[in-house]
Amino acid sequence: MIKFKFLLWVLAQLLQRKINSNPDCARYVDGKRLTFQIRTAAGAGRYYVVENGKVRSSSGLTDSAQFTLSFVNAHKGFEILSAKDAQPAFLRGVGSKDLVISGNFLEVLWFQGLTEFLQPPKVIDSLDRTAF
C-alpha cells in the first residue's frame, strides 16, 4: 500500500517537472482543465487537478473527477502503473478487471498522451539509421 501511495504522489511531481522542462509538454497541458483520480477498490487513492499549466494532487478522493482509474488493490495498481510496457500493462489490467475505468474516456486518452511525455526518449541504434 505504501509503494502505491508513494507512486501516486511521485506521479504529480514527475508530471510537473516535465511540464516545467519540456516546452512540448507545457503546450500539451496549456489551457487544459481536468480533475481525475486514481484509487483502489478499498478507497485509498489520490486526485489530481490539471489547470493553468500546473498539476497538483491531494490525498483522498473527490466527487468531481472527470474520470477515475480504480484498481482492484494497491499491489495491482503499483504493478500496472510502474510496468515498463505501460500501455500493454494498462490494457491487460482492463481486460482482467484489475483496472476499471469510469468517466470520460476522451479525457483518459488525453491523460495517456500526457503520460507519454514521462517515457524516456527512444534511442535509435546507429545501424538502424537509414536515408529512407
Which residues are covered by each model-predicted region?
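Feature captures hydrophobic
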Residues: 1-132
